[in-house]
Amino acid sequence: MRDLKTYLSVAPVLSTLWFGSLAGLLIEINRLFPDALTFPFF
């Protein structure tokens, strides 16, 4: 039961950090390549 409580307290923190970094990455991509419907990498 203690492991379940540890998991339930760690999962929101990790998901917040993951989605925050993903949002920051998308914001930076949109800042460098504005209005890109297809990524001009290839």
Swiss-Prot record:
Q: Where in the cell is it found?
A: Plastid, Chloroplast thylakoid membrane
Its chief place of residence is plastid
The protein's matches in Gene3D superfamilies, at most eight in alphabetical order, are given as: Single helix bin
Q: Which GO terms describe its biological process?
A: photosynthesis
Family membership: Belongs to the PsaJ family.
Name of protein? Photosystem I reaction center subunit IX
Coiled-coil regions, chain positions: none
Keywords (alphabetical) are: Chloroplast, Membrane, Photosynthesis, Photosystem I, Plastid, Thylakoid, Transmembrane, Transmembrane helix
Query: Membrane-crossing residues?
Result: 7-27
| Organism encoding this protein | Lepidium virginicum
What does this protein do, in the record's words?
May help in the organization of the PsaE and PsaF subunits.
Its Gene Ontology cellular component terms are:
chloroplast thylakoid membrane; photosystem I
What is the recorded membrane topology of this protein?
A: Single-pass membrane protein
Q: Which domain of life is it from?
A: Eukaryota
